[in-house]
Design a protein with these regions (language model features):
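Binding-site signature for planar aromatic cofactors or substrates
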Residues: 1-110
């Protein structure tokens, strides 16, 4: 197995992405993304902080998040194990990623 030590070497192993995967990256929510998020009952909240990365499952019987506007999602923090890993990471480093899943669908929205 060969080690990959540069971005150029990595990209040399793959074809360029097709236009459709590139087109789905948006700076704000689209109507389709808003609908998907409203149907999602499970989301994975991923954060990064001084001790590394963390992925926290969040679910509910109704919508998991509230859409405040096309740039802001509200995700409640339910009582859990009180480890606060994700919240600590957000305080230290505001980068977050959300992966929304809808029951019965094979696709996800990130």
């Amino acid at each position: 197995m060969k080690s990959i030590t540069s971005i150029e070497a990595l990209e040399g192993l793959y074809d360029a992405p097709l236009p459709s995967p590139l087109a789905k990256v948006k700076k704000t929510l689209t109507p389709n993304y808003r609908k998907w998020i409203s149907l999602a009952r499970f989301v994975v909240l991923s954060t990064v902080g001084p001790e590394g990365a963390d992925a926290s499952p969040r679910g509910d019987i109704g919508p998991v998040v509230t859409i405040q506007n096309d740039n802001t999602l509200l995700l409640p923090d339910w009582r859990g194990n009180n480890r606060l890993d994700s919240l600590r990471n957000i305080v230290c480093d505001g980068r977050v990623s959300l992966m929304f899943m809808v029951p019965g669908c094979k696709n996800v929205v990130r």
